[in-house]
Amino acid sequence: MSSRVLTPDVVGIDALVHDHQTVLAKAEGGVVAVFANNAPAFYAVTPARLAELLALEEKLARPGSDVALDDQLYQEPQAAPVAVPMGKFAMYPDWQPDADFIRLAALWGVALRAPVTTEELASFIAYWQAEGKVFHHVQWQQKLARSLQIGRASNGGLPKRDVNTVSEPDSQIPPGFRG
């Protein structure tokens, strides 16, 4: 099992138990990684360093601006959840994948880095509504996962280019060509 140690100071648990004050006093940054059986067990932190970390956490929890935005302007009304039909059904406009869709997609062998966007879902629903085919809910989710995998990989993972922008000439010379 691999692990990452977040401090250069490492000590065995026996040494810490034997003389914890000396170990913590010598620690760079007030933090020591404590190992037990050649594996990281926990971190020992000085009270001063703990106070610094808590102050930093409190500072980061505060908003960066004193301007308060009205939340109701940004919250879209939540639609009432639609019950998933039993058995096979044709695609309908309010269809939604399950809340744990990303996890399910991983189980089906499709690693999705980001959740489905509203645009991707709308495109998927519009296509399959026109097709008129019927599938079970799980099958629809599998089709959505494959569709996202293919759609996102088609451009090397890059977002689609805007067709309305004017292209600019490339001034770089490819490797192997003389300029």
Curated annotation (Swiss-Prot):
Involved in the restart of stalled replication forks, which reloads the replicative helicase on sites other than the origin of replication. Can function in multiple replication restart pathways. Displaces ssDNA from a PriB-ssDNA complex. Probably forms a spiral filament on ssDNA. Keywords: DNA replication, DNA-binding, Primosome. InterPro entries: DnaT, DnaT_DNA_bind. GO terms for cellular component: primosome complex. Pfam families: DnaT (PF17948). It comes from the Bacteria. HAMAP family: DnaT. Homooligomerizes. Interacts with PriB. Component of the replication restart primosome. Primosome assembly occurs via a 'hand-off' mechanism. PriA binds to replication forks, subsequently PriB then DnaT bind; DnaT then displaces ssDNA to generate the helicase loading substrate. This is Replication restart protein DnaT. Belongs to the DnaT family. Coiled coil: none annotated. One of its GO terms (biological process) is DNA replication, synthesis of primer. Residues 156-179 are annotated as: Disordered.
